[in-house]
């Protein structure tokens, strides 16, 4: 379905390019639109046909392009008009040859066949060519001055340069869609999917979340209810004079200052115990022990 619509749009764009390359006079456009209005007002007239291959499974036929003012006698021709006399290809409208240039590719008539097989004709640009999404046989497209209220193209008065002023309104989505609309809808779904995936990557993974503890409250007291028990800090001094190794062990109070050298400090706070538990069981405390050989030092 989308491929058929894209093909119709492409053919319509070719018509627009031909008009821009060699624009037609405003008088010729007005007469062509008047003739088209007469056909639209009389649906009982003979309907236009074109030679084409059989339609595919989609039910849409290939468009037939017929140039106005392109050949014989200098008179512009358009398909599907006339009150009885017509050949297989074209029918003369009787416009004066001076209105259109003989070498111009001219205004092109674009034909679209709906699902019911009826031809829909219009002198309009590609944006106004829409294929109905339903299979209703009565739903046909019209063009020209007497377009239906569902049409999205209104051809206004021609300007001084000979171009037709076209006011394009938004096409109702419920009635049909163009190939560009299909592409836009697919692109929107892709962008939405990418947006959801990017949001999912921002979620923190379970088991790898870093929980930072809150900062401490300065109003709370820093001291605990139970005071820290004072104790002793074990000090060891090794002296080697080249012959023997002297080892001294003792405990300094916890309130004493730690220095680089070895000192025997005293308690200044009055809360440290006189003798710690380790000093009570260690027989080498406050006793200098010397060893003649290094392997004799216990580990």
Swiss-Prot record:
Region Interaction with host STAT1, annotated ranges: 110-120
Superkingdom, natural source: Viruses
GO molecular function: metal ion binding
Entry keyword Zinc: yes
UniProt region (Disordered), positions on chain: 40-98, 134-174, 204-230
Biased composition (Acidic residues): 146-160
Name assigned to this protein: Non-structural protein V
Gene name tied to this protein: P/V
């Amino acid at each position: 379905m989308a491929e058929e619509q894209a093909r119709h749009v492409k053919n319509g764009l070719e018509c627009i390019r031909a008009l821009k390359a060699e624009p037609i006079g405003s008088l010729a456009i007005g007469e062509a639109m008047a003739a088209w209005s007469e056909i639209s007002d009389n649906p009982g007239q003979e309907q236009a046909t074109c030679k084409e291959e059989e339609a595919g499974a989609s039910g849409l036929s290939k468009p037939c392009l017929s140039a106005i003012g392109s050949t014989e006698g200098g008179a512009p021709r358009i398909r599907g008009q006339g009150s009885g006399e017509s050949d297989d290809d074209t029918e003369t409208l009787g416009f004066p040859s001076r209105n259109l240039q003989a070498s111009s590719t001219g205004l092109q008539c674009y034909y679209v066949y709906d699902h019911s097989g009826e031809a829909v004709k219009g002198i309009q640009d590609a944006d106004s060519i829409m294929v109905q999404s339903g299979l209703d046989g009565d739903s046909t497209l019209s063009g020209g001055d007497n377009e239906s209220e569902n049409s999205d193209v209104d051809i206004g008065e021609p300007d001084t340069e000979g171009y037709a002023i076209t006011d394009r309104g938004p096409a109702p989505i419920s009635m049909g869609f163009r190939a560009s609309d299909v592409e836009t809808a697919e692109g929107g779904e892709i962008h939405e999917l990418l947006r959801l995936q990017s949001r999912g990557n921002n979620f923190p993974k379970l088991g790898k979340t870093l929980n930072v503890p809150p900062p401490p409250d300065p109003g709370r007291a820093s001291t605990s209810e139970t005071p820290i028990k004072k104790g002793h800090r074990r000090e060891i001094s090794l002296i080697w004079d080249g012959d023997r190794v002297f080892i001294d062990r003792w405990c300094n109070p916890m309130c004493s200052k730690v220095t680089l050298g070895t000192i025997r400090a005293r308690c200044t706070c009055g809360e440290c115990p006189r003798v710690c538990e380790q000093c009570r069981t260690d027989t080498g405390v406050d006793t200098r022990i010397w060893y003649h050989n290094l392997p004799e030092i216990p580990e």
